[in-house]
């Protein structure tokens, strides 16, 4: 899998092989939840971060390699490119139509039942799907990074961020 277009084709193939989950419900490439949305559609923003290796900074993405900042609404921005990707998934029937109305718990039920093929978050993907039962049936969700993908490692920003480690004295 080289790029986002290849991912769409892979997801189409997966849906053809596995059109329903363990409970007989339709399967989807991805399932989102709006509970955590803020300035952006959180999952779309996070997919841009995961794919391009650019971190969220203000209302845009920051490239830690070059120092460039991309305003989210500029043509060709990582965020708009990911919105186009998710629109393609939607038009192909690969994006869960409940994505903008369901909560995290409902989305996780779908993951646990095998109704979701991919997640950029381990806690909302493999950690939820890879149960002892699924593993015994040789049903396993694993990581996939397209060749053109460049995931970011958090904690490297010289500008700070919203990740904090703390400990109380009492």
Identify the role of each PLM range.
Residues 1-170:
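Extracytoplasmic/secretory soluble proteins
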